[in-house]
């Protein structure tokens, strides 16, 4: 199914920003669709923006609507395996997500990025670089704007971040280039295991002209041999990698230097990889990357991702709230340069993760670890230099008297936020406010 042929009744599951974008898009179609919305929340966000002709059922599921639908457009947070969707699926009703609707409508080239970690940075950076090269580019998907809202920008290139959840309900998205950055344990409360999770991610390559894969993570390679691959890694390579010349490390293509690593606006080894991917994606999409190097030099990253939010008396406060899994926190720890002690804040909702992978990195650092939230206690056995707190506020109140010149306070929780916060952004904003408060205290 790649269009609305034969469709009359459409049920949208889940409102919010994405759900509203779906409703608006459906009502713009010439087929005069009848659109209904189901949201299990009593007062769904965005309900006041629904047009009068769109009926809303809130507070519970509405099975009759689902069984009568010709098409169901579901929120990425709802698994296809859920008992509520299964009766309609077994009946043969198509169930898609907003990215599939985007695929039906888009006419300009599209680039997509997925992976366990780094995808937001790569997506944002790729968009910035493309715009700098003179290509009118729209960026969104799992970051910023909902994909369907991007269509209103009438861009010449679309750059999408796609989560595994979004890819589950996407089957016809044609891409000029797609990148699978890395694979590490995440969302084990949703998937049966790592291979199930990997297969969801690999769907990004289904209709991609070029597949960007990680030489240091073979799990990112497609299972079939009929794909055009371009790889990136930290080694010397005929593709995208690193070389050393005159004692300096350079990002390179075909063993030819592109830009020195110490000229990048982003810091940390993982951001060398992120920059290589952005270059590979744009090159595959036909964008002149020579015009993008100044952007690589000035781009300093996303809010909530290893972002210095306050600095006073030699103490830096770093907001890495977007580190919602173990691999993200490991990446943050591997790129650190600290004169004094690291005060690390971890915890939240662990999503079934194995936190023991953090132990080797923790052992290498002079630190105190403050464990808070629903699964904070699970971090305590990892290191004897740990303290258990109920909340992040309590943790910062505890550590603030101990701060000295050269120390760093870092929120890199390795967990989701929804036990105590609406989302990772709200958690990061709360940390930033606390950082500024304690940095200015007399």
From Swiss-Prot:
Associated pathway: Cell wall biogenesis; peptidoglycan biosynthesis
InterPro entries cross-referenced by the UniProt entry: Mur-like_cat_sf (IPR036565), Mur_ligase_C (IPR004101), Mur_ligase_C_dom_sf (IPR036615), Mur_ligase_cen (IPR013221), MurD (IPR005762)
A single cellular component GO annotation: cytoplasm
Principal localisation: cytoplasm
Top-level taxon of the source organism: Bacteria
Disulfide bonds: none
Keyword annotations: ATP-binding, Cell cycle, Cell division, Cell shape, Cell wall biogenesis/degradation, Cytoplasm, Ligase, Nucleotide-binding, Peptidoglycan synthesis
EC number(s) from the headed UniProt entry: 6.3.2.9
GO biological process terms held by the UniProt record: cell division; cell wall organization; peptidoglycan biosynthetic process; regulation of cell shape
Compartments in which it is found: Cytoplasm
Catalytic activity: UDP-N-acetyl-alpha-D-muramoyl-L-alanine + D-glutamate + ATP = UDP-N-acetyl-alpha-D-muramoyl-L-alanyl-D-glutamate + ADP + phosphate + H(+)
GO molecular function: ATP binding; UDP-N-acetylmuramoylalanine-D-glutamate ligase activity
Record-listed ATP binding positions: 115-121
NCBIfam families in UniProt: murD
Family affiliation: Belongs to the MurCDEF family.
Protein role: Cell wall formation. Catalyzes the addition of glutamate to the nucleotide precursor UDP-N-acetylmuramoyl-L-alanine (UMA).
This protein's name: UDP-N-acetylmuramoylalanine--D-glutamate ligase
Organism annotation: Aliivibrio salmonicida (strain LFI1238) (Vibrio salmonicida (strain LFI1238))
């Amino acid at each position: 199914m790649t269009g609305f042929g034969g469709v009359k009744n459409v049920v949208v599951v889940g409102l919010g920003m994405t759900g509203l974008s779906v409703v608006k898009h459906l009502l713009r179609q010439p087929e005069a669709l009848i659109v209904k919305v189901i949201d299990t929340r009593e007062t769904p966000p965005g309900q006041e923006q629904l047009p009068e002709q769109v009926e809303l059922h809130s507070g519970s599921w509405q099975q009759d609507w689902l069984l009568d639908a010709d098409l169901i457009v579901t929120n990425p947070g709802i698994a296809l395996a859920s008992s509520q969707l299964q009766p309609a699926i077994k009946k043969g009703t198509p169930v898609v997500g907003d990215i599939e609707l985007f695929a039906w409508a888009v006419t300009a080239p599209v680039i997509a990025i997925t992976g366990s970690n780094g995808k937001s940075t790569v997506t944002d950076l790729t968009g910035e670089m493309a715009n700098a090269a003179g290509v009118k580019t729209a960026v969104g998907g799992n970051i910023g704007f909902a994909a369907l809202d991007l269509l209103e920008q009438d861009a010449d290139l679309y750059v999408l971040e796609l989560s595994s959840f979004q890819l589950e309900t996407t089957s016809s998205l044609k891409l000029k280039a797609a990148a699978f950055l890395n694979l590490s344990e995440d969302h084990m409360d949703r998937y049966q295991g790592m291979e199930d999770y990997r297969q969801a991610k690999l769907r990004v390559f289904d209709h991609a002209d070029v597949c960007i894969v990680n030489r240091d993570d073979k799990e990112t390679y497609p299972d079939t041999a009929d794909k055009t691959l371009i790889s990136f890694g930290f080694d010397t390579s005929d593709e995208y990698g690193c070389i050393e010349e005159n004692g300096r490390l350079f990002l390179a293509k075909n063993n030819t230097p592109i830009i020195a690593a110490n000229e990048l606006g982003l810091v940390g080894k993982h951001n060398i990889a992120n920059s290589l991917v952005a270059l590979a994606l744009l090159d595959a999409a036909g964008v002149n990357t020579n015009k993008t190097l100044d952007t690589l030099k000035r781009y300093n990253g996303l809010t909530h991702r290893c972002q210095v939010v306050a600095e006073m008396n030699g103490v830096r406060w770093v907001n890495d709230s977007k580190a919602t899994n173990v691999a993200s926190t490991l990446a943050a720890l591997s790129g650190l340069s600290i004169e004094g002690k690291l005060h690390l804040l971890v915890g939240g909702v662990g999503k079934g993760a194995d936190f023991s992978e953090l132990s080797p990195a923790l052992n290498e650092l002079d630190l105190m670890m403050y464990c808070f939230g629903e699964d904070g206690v699970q971090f305590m056995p990892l290191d004897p230099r740990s303290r258990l707190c109920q909340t992040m506020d309590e943790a910062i109140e505890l550590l603030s008297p101990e701060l000295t010149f050269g120390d760093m306070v870092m929120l890199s929780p390795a967990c989701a936020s929804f036990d105590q916060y609406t989302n990772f952004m709200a958690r990061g904003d709360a940390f930033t406010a606390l950082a500024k408060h304690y940095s200015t205290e007399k």
